[in-house]
């Protein structure tokens, strides 16, 4: 993996299977977490959706806040929403962009787990720098100890709660809430997932 890109095999999967993934994710989106996220924001001026994927969250947020920046390395994903109002799409990895205190919130729903650990930490720092003071960061990620490729070729680097919590605090975040839930993957396999809400100090 190059220093500024997601795993190429993973991106190719989403480019090739974007319609199937969009349909699956639509059926599995309730917007409960998005509503919680919005309720915790100090202000609702601008949000960045890191690894926006199918764009369901970006579209939902775009109706609630002034501006959404939807970021994803898959051009097939960003093409689906690039002409919608209040959404600015960027086809790139979080590792290749730089923002300074312009977003009130950052939303990364199961996207950073496609990065190696060291790149996850780099992405978290980029997100931290992109947030205004007291900005809110949501991170959804699979819980686990070992990285792997699934049967579809996607790279997964799940994390242990304590290790990830320590990493976020080291960067400068204050943890507001962490919950662990059981779920099913795109392949319908049982998984554990973490929902993490933290604030920029």
Q: What are the language-model segments listed below?
A:
Residues 1-98, 118-122, 126, 136-201:
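Class I (Rossmann-like) S-adenosyl-L-methionine-dependent methyltransferase catalytic domain
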Residues 104:
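Conserved acidic residues
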Residues 107:
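A conserved beta-strand element that flanks and buttresses the S-adenosyl-L-methionine
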Residues 110-111:
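Short catalytic micro-motifs in class I SAM-dependent methyltransferases
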Residues 115-116, 131-133:
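Helix-to-beta-strand junctions that scaffold the AdoMet/dcAdoMet cofactor pocket
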